[in-house]
Amino acid sequence: MRGRQDGDAVDRAGLRLKLLKQQAEAGDIALLFADESEALTHPYLAHAWAKRGADLRVPAPGQSRKLALLGGLDHGAARLIVHRSRTKRSTDFISLLEAIDTHYGPRPGRVSKPAVLVLDNGPIHTSKLTRAALAQRPWLTIEWLPKYAPELNDIERSWRDLKRHFLAHQTFSSVEQLDAAVALAVDHLNHERGSHLCHDQRIAA
């Protein structure tokens, strides 16, 4: 992946993101990192403890099915917003934008701060349909990442945490069961991060 990167573009993007993170941590902007992932009905295999020489087996009957996860990570609040879908299309990404509207969009009586959405150049982010939806949200500034630089997108760590700590070594009998498990996992992850953030803020005060 690194061999295909434009090193200068990655360095410049990294510096811009560093400044944006400082603004978000100061409370001046809302900074969101967005991207997609997927969860499977078959087990996600993470690190596990076992006796030396033991043969660990996780049952995985039938054919694995997928659930698309389209998410936005709020850098300042450490909150993960996830839209779950059977598909990963522009219309699904627009559903994520609508969820972001709920939390960050202008609304009567709400004091809104500038919002920045960090995106890669994936096809559902750059489609005609998505670009039209983004144009309808002038309050949302897009920070485009350079190609082949997933390490700049902080949401990737959240996807790993979600799967490793809440979905690992489990088999789900249906997509519906998986969907419910992911919804619960996102709630738990946000609760944990919110508790840690409050604790850190009390220490800083």
Regions found by a protein language model. Give the residues of each.
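Conserved short alpha-helical interface segments
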Residues: 1-4, 37-39
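Extended, low-complexity cationic-aromatic segments
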Residues: 9-99, 199-204
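C-terminal anion-handling pockets and recognition modules
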Residues: 28-29, 155-205
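The start of beta-strands in P-loop NTPase/AAA+ ATPase cores
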Residues: 30, 115-116, 141
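Mobile genetic element proteins and their domesticated derivatives, centered on retroelements
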Residues: 33-35, 71-72, 78, 97, ...
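RNase H-like polynucleotidyl transferase catalytic core
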Residues: 55-62, 138-157, 171
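Acidic/histidine-rich, metal-coordinating catalytic segments
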Residues: 97, 109-126, 148, 153
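Short, aromatic/basic amphipathic alpha-helical patches
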Residues: 127-137
